[in-house]
Each structure stands twice: as C-alpha cells, then as structure tokens.
Amino acid sequence: DRDSCVDKSRCQKYGPYGQCTDCCKKAGHTGGTCIYFKCKCGAESGR
C-alpha cells in the first residue's frame, strides 16, 4: 500500500525515483514522486 512504498523507497528530496515509482505501480497507483525524501504515490490506476 501507499505507506509501505514510503518505507521501502528512500529518495532524493524532490522528483521522480525509480524504486518509488515501481513500488507505487505494483500497489496499483499510476506512479510516484519524491517529496521531502519520502515516496508519495500518485492516483490509483484502473479504478
């Protein structure tokens, strides 16, 4: 889920990050972005 992606995907302060995006996609989101070193998932896909 969204929170597990935050825990697994440490990242730079801002911008896209591969692990973050991949984690979010597996969780059913369209992708993810890094905000203040945390992975934030985008809108859910296919719902």
Swiss-Prot record:
UniProt cross-references to PROSITE patterns, sorted A to Z: ERGTX
Disulfide bonds: C5-C23, C11-C34, C20-C39, C24-C41
Domain of life, source organism: Eukaryota
Pfam families reported for this sequence: Toxin_17 (PF08086)
Any one of the GO CC terms: extracellular region
UniProt subcellular location: Secreted
Keywords associated with the record: Disulfide bond, Ion channel impairing toxin, Knottin, Neurotoxin, Potassium channel impairing toxin, Secreted, Toxin, Voltage-gated potassium channel impairing toxin
Gene3D superfamilies: Knottin, scorpion toxin-like (3.30.30.10)
GO MF term list: potassium channel inhibitor activity; toxin activity
Known tissue expression: Expressed by the venom gland.
InterPro entries for this protein: Ergtoxin (IPR012622), Scorpion_toxin-like_sf (IPR036574)
Comment text on domains: The presence of a 'disulfide through disulfide knot' structurally defines this protein as a knottin. Has the CSalpha/beta fold, which comprises one or two short alpha helices connected to anti-parallel beta-sheets stabilized by three or four disulfide bonds.
Family the UniProt entry places it in: Belongs to the ergtoxin family. Gamma-KTx 5 subfamily.
Biological function: Reversibly blocks Kv11/ERG potassium channels.
Protein known as: Potassium channel toxin gamma-KTx 5.2
Organism expressing this protein natively: Centruroides gracilis (Slenderbrown scorpion)
